[in-house]
Amino acid sequence: LEVVTLEDHSVPLVTIELAVRNGSFTEPPELNGLSHLYEHMFFKANRAIANAEQYLQKIGQLGIAYNATTREEVVHYYFTTTSPNLRTAMNFMRDASRHPLFDKGEFEPERQVVIGEIDRNESNPYYYLNLEMTNRLYYKYPSRKNPLGNRQTVSAATTDMMRLIQSRYYVPNNSALIVTGDVQFEEIFKMAQELFADWPRRDRDPF
């Protein structure tokens, strides 16, 4: 796991980001959009938190801002919080990245959310124009330039496919942990060692 940290003590805030070499460029056509769907499942139930409702409640109590983005070659997640909550946010990142449950009761509604996102984008003429241009420019593998995904593959997705993505890409030698803000270098590297040292390495998928 590559760990990057940047100190800035001007305000008592920290941001923790996990960047994973994943995204549409890593997907075969039959999995197009599943990196995006996986991103939507990241802030759900895991080993430490029973369900998404409890997850959001805990985050809200601590005033943690969070978000995620799926691009062609990277999926990244972040938490921003006050510096006293650093360890708690690091624990959240560890449990979400390493121990997701992929609860089927949470998976189906989230799959519908992603399908709705695809439908909304495809109803936009500018998105459709860009999609058609991509299909012609990258005619052999156009799906690799479409991180949003397509309706057919997302509709057919299962929790087993989420596990497949996790096993291929969510490994320490395919990820980077970036921590910035009101932190100390030594503290971050020590904490990363404590929380992520036993994360099993795997052979990276050759895409």
Residue ranges: model-predicted function:
Residues 44-48, 80-111:
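M16/insulysin-pitrilysin zinc metalloprotease superfamily fold
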Residues 101-119, 184, 203-207:
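Acidic/histidine-enriched alpha-helical segments
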Residues 15-80, 123, 144-148:
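M16/MPP (pitrilysin/insulinase) zinc-metallopeptidase core fold and M16-derived inactive scaffolds
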Residues 139-140, 147, 171-172, 176-207:
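An aromatic/glycine/proline-enriched structural segment found at the starts
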